[in-house]
C-alpha cells in the first residue's frame, strides 16, 4: 500500500539536479517542463517505439536521436540538448540510473573494435543524417553534391594509433598486444571518421556499414586519448548543404551548435569549422560577440583583457585535452562560441519584421509559430521562450495567424488565461477542420447556385406583386368609371322625372313651356358689349 511505480522519466525528475549537472557537462541547458514534454508527448510520435514514461534503451535513444538530427524541416534542433543528455544518462549512467540500464555487451578481446563488428548490425542502424556518413538513399539528390571519403587516408588512421593532440608518444609498434595493429589489407575501412564523434569515455556502438567508429578522442592501446580531425568531406557537405550565416543565421547556428555538442571539437577544430562555414567578416563578428560574453569571477560580463584572453583566446592556447583542466577549458570555450553565434546572428531590433511574419494559406500553426519565434530571436533582443514574453508572443500569434484562425482565436472564452500552448492546440484544431480545395470549390458553387435561385425567386415574386398591384389599380379605375356612369344616368333620370308635362323648364311654372315662358327674354340678341382695354395714353 502506498507504493508508487518508478519510471525512467520520474527517476530523472527525482534527480533533476544531477540531470542539470550532466547537461552542463555536455555544454547544454535543459528545462524540466520541456524535458517532460519531449519525453511524454513528442518522442512517442516518432514511431520508433519510445514509451511515454521514457526508457534507457540505447537502441531507442539512438533512433530518436536520428529523428532529432534530421536535416531540413523534419529535424528538431530545439530537442538536441535533451536527447544528448538522455543519451549521456544511458551511455554513462550515474549510480541511480544503473539499475534501469540494460547490461552492456561484453567488451571485445582486442581493442581494435572500430575495424571489425563484434555482433550483427541492428535492424535499424543508429546513424544520424546530420553526419555525412554514406547511405544508399543519398544518391537520389543531384544537388548539392555530397562527397564521400576516399578511404585512403582513413586506412592509415585506423590501422595505427595516431599521435595525441599536443603530446607525441612512441609509435604503437613498441607495445605488445596494442590495439593499433594493422588491419588486414582486404578489410574495408569505415565510411567516415566523423560519423560518430563521441566522448572517449563512452563505449562505441555496434559497427555497421554506414556508421564510422573513428572518434575524435579515442582511448588507444596505452589508455591515452587520441585525436581525430574533421574530414574534408564533412566540412564540404556541411558548407554546401546549408545556407550562409548572413542568409539564415538560425539554421547555421543550430548546425554548428549540434556539431559542438556532439563532436566535442578542440580549439583547432573550432577554428577550422568557423573558417569553413563562415566568411571572414562573419567569423570576426562571432568571435567579438563571444568575447563579450565572457564573465568574470563575480558572474558579470568582464572587459579585463587577461580574463577575456584566458577564457576565449584568439591565439592557439596550451589546453591539453587529455587532462580534466584542459577539457574544462574546451567546454567553456564552446559555450562562449555558441553564445557568440547566437548574438552575432541577431539583427538590429526591428519589430516591423516581426509583424511582417504572417501565416501562409496552407501553413500549419506549429510551423508558423516556429517562424514567429525565429523572427523574435533574430530581430528583437527578447527570448520567445522566456515566460515573461509569452503574452507578447501569444498576441502576435493571434493577430498574425490566418484570418479564419485569428477570428476564432479572438472569440475564445477566457482568452486572457489561455497559454501559448492552448492557443496552438486550438489553432491546430481549427486548421485541421478546414475544408479542402475541392470542398471549398463545391461550397462556392453551391452558394452561387443558391444565390441565383434566390434572386430568380425574388424576381418572380416582385413581378407577381407588380401584376397584382397593376390589376388592383385597373380594377379600381374601372370600378370608378362604372360607378360614375351609373350615377350620372340615375341623376339624369331623376332630373327628367321631376318636371311635369306642362311645366316650364325655364321658370319651372306650370301651364306653359319654356318657349312660351313670359319671363324668357324676347327679341333679337344684341351684340355683346366690347371690353375696353386701357392703353399707355390713357
Curated annotation (Swiss-Prot):
Residues 111-222, 435-499, 513-538 are annotated as: Disordered. Keywords: Capsid protein, Host cell membrane, Host membrane, Host-virus interaction, Lipoprotein, Membrane, Metal-binding, Myristate, Viral budding, Viral budding via the host ESCRT complexes, Viral matrix protein, Viral nucleoprotein, Viral release from host cell, Virion, Zinc, Zinc-finger. InterPro entries: G_retro_matrix (IPR000840), G_retro_matrix_sf (IPR036946), Gag_p12 (IPR002079), Gag_P30 (IPR003036), Retrov_capsid_N (IPR008919), Retroviral_Gag-Pol_poly (IPR050462), Retrovr_matrix (IPR010999), Znf_CCHC (IPR001878). A motif (PPXY motif) lies at residues 162-165. The keyword Lipoprotein applies. A zinc finger (CCHC-type) spans 502-519. It comes from the Viruses. A motif (PTAP/PSAP motif) lies at residues 111-114. A lipid is attached at residue 2 (N-myristoyl glycine). One of its GO terms (molecular function) is zinc ion binding. The record marks 131-132, 215-216, 478-479 as: Cleavage. Residues 163-178, 435-466, 486-499 have a biased composition (Basic and acidic residues). One of its GO terms (biological process) is viral budding via host ESCRT complex. The keyword ATP-binding does not apply. One of its GO terms (cellular component) is membrane. A motif (LYPX(n)L motif) lies at residues 130-134. It holds the Pfam family Gag_p12. This is Gag polyprotein. It comes from Moloney murine sarcoma virus (MoMSV).
